[in-house]
Amino acid sequence: MIRDERWFGVYSFEDTPFLMETLTDLRNINTDNISFRKGLVRLGRYMGYELTKTMEFEKINITTPLEKTEGIISKDRKNVVIITILRAAFPLMEGLIKTLESAKVGIISASRGHAPKFNIEMNYVKVPRVTENDTIIIADPMIATGSTLINVLTELKKSEKSKRIVILGVLAAPEGIDSIKKAFPDVEIFVTKIDRELNKDGYIVPGLGDAGDRAFGEPFKVSLLPQMHNLE
């Protein structure tokens, strides 16, 4: 894990060959949906493990079948709330849950519009109650412009007081990190790699494409609400 000296509280895993190999698979245009999802799960699980190294631990006394000894327990692992940004972050959350089994989970549906305005629409928020002892982990594979996460953080800060807020992603653009850190300097960011830049359409380059489409398939637009009302 490397601390990026351009910002305070920003870390990448560019020094970890296993994660870099997984990222290489995700970048590859020939990687299919199933393999892409599995790759996101692997990244979430390993990055969750690395994140536990930054949590507080305390020593305890225990008794083995042979004698008394000392051990350690995490003071934070049972006080974690993972917030998933629909839909691309689901596999990332699945990996995190494998490491942070006691975590509570919240879901936020947020989408970013097209260039040049990149308007953000949030139409579903379901987040469990957060305490001052909790660490909030926001899972979002791609930190591009940062606008989606800034909106999410703004909503969370209105009503929730936590011990710590962490953004965990796969790729980030420097522009997105700049925006987030200017708005919320205390938020920590952990990503597999920080890429070069955003292109004119707001995509990270070299990037890996649309993480949601590559994990679950390209969607088509359909309106189900009128039909659902008719079922009653």
Curated annotation (Swiss-Prot):
Catalyzes the conversion of uracil and 5-phospho-alpha-D-ribose 1-diphosphate (PRPP) to UMP and diphosphate. NCBIfam families: PRK00129.1, upp. The gene is upp. The keyword Transferase applies. Binds 1 Mg(2+) ion per subunit. The magnesium is bound as Mg-PRPP. This is Uracil phosphoribosyltransferase. It comes from Methanococcus vannielii (strain ATCC 35089 / DSM 1224 / JCM 13029 / OCM 148 / SB). It comes from the Archaea. Disulfide bonds: none annotated.
